[in-house]
């Protein structure tokens, strides 16, 4: 009986340590990114923005919370032909390859060709009744998430949006 209790306590302690390590690892990884790496496209006009270390860490966490269920690794589970890789984002109509255009998409999602509004099918600030994880996301949160999406190809390369061949 004592052995079972000891073993259970050991496993719980190990799980807690791993959780703490995982949480702190994201902040440590963000701190290692240079300003050049953290610079992403701000708008369709081609202006750039350098994400703060806080935005990078929050973007990663918020993406995992609100988007990761369907977009882990930059893929789209419901449509493997459309990912979050730079090429797919640039070829969307309108292009979704900047922070401002991704934030717009999170407010007003449309099909890849831009012809139909899909807020009832894709999480957005319009559909918080259907997708409650979007309820409490602020504009700053949406900017951080968008920055995370644009930053990932610089960090993980072609793995981001690459699909099953990488994960």
UniProtKB/Swiss-Prot annotation:
Manner of cofactor binding, per the entry note: Binds 1 heme c group covalently per subunit.
GO molecular function: electron transfer activity; heme binding; iron ion binding
Membrane topology: Peripheral membrane protein
TM region(s), chain numbering: none
Secretion signal, residue range per the UniProt entry: 1-30
Keyword annotations: Electron transport, Heme, Iron, Membrane, Metal-binding, Photosynthesis, Photosystem II, Signal, Thylakoid, Transport
Top-rank taxon, per record: Bacteria
Annotated GO CC locations: photosystem II; plasma membrane-derived thylakoid membrane
Binding site for heme c: 67, 70-71, 122
InterPro entries the record matches: Cyt_c-like_dom (IPR009056), Cyt_c-like_dom_sf (IPR036909), Cytochrom_C550 (IPR029490), PsbV_cyt_c550 (IPR017851), PsbV_cyt_c550-like (IPR016003)
PROSITE patterns: CYTC (PS51007)
Subcellular location, record wording: Cellular thylakoid membrane
Cofactor (UniProt): heme c
Subunit structure: PSII is composed of 1 copy each of membrane proteins PsbA, PsbB, PsbC, PsbD, PsbE, PsbF, PsbH, PsbI, PsbJ, PsbK, PsbL, PsbM, PsbT, PsbX, PsbY, PsbZ, Psb30/Ycf12, peripheral proteins PsbO, CyanoQ (PsbQ), PsbU, PsbV and a large number of cofactors. It forms dimeric complexes.
UniProt family annotation: Belongs to the cytochrome c family. PsbV subfamily.
Biological role: One of the extrinsic, lumenal subunits of photosystem II (PSII). PSII is a light-driven water plastoquinone oxidoreductase, using light energy to abstract electrons from H(2)O, generating a proton gradient subsequently used for ATP formation. The extrinsic proteins stabilize the structure of photosystem II oxygen-evolving complex (OEC), the ion environment of oxygen evolution and protect the OEC against heat-induced inactivation. Low-potential cytochrome c that plays a role in the OEC of PSII.
Name of this protein: Photosystem II extrinsic protein V
